[in-house]
Amino acid sequence: MVWPPVCATRADGSGRISVDLMPTPHINAADGAFAETVLMPGDPRRATHIAERFLTNAELVTDVRGTLGYTGTYEGTTVSVMASGMGMPSAAIYITELLRAYGVRRIIRVGTAGVYAPDLALRQIVAATGAVTNSNLPAIIGAPDTLAPSPELLATAERVAEATGVALATGTVFTSDIFYEPNDDARHEHTANGVLAVEMETAALYAIAAVEGAEALTLLTMTDHLVTGEHLSSEERQLTVDEMLELGLRTAIAV
């Protein structure tokens, strides 16, 4: 089975759109517009924040559907940033097109998550060493049963965190297709199995990277505590995630 099974119709009547061609259906960047390593926040505004605050000579390279991508340099190394939108279906589109059409080899997701583990604090940064999910996406695309990050990227992030004094926790996250869970059953079940937090994209990233032979890692800042009910405000979120973003960028240039 060839994945993804794209079903839009071309002008030539072939009935398929290849994601090996540029621009792709969802990215209007030119050939060579992306670096080999991409930081991937969910929020397009966070992509802009990364570009404006951390990158030198950052240029907007894609803006289809308001999903923004930039390329610039960080400490002299070329790095790109590309938003994924929310959830696995959206993230899967951008991950696939970046890897297949634009020569991207590494994607580091930099996002936020809700805390499942009672002893995990708000603002804690977590590197996802695995992902479990209620989505069928990994099975549909033929991904391995175990969804894990690139060992090299994970080791690099841990090394950079230690060198820069960043407290980095590691563990499994739950990638959910449902933001508004109808009850706490899933949280209690996953907490019992040692899952640290819940988010909505990592399983897709790890699954597609495995199928495509690419490297991937997720870094998450804990912004909502589903045990205590604590939440960070929008302003607190922005200030808090900068430490994670710098860790992601330093990992990107150190690998």
Where are these regions (language model features)?
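Zn-dependent metallopeptidase/amidohydrolase metal-coordination segment
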Residues: 203-236
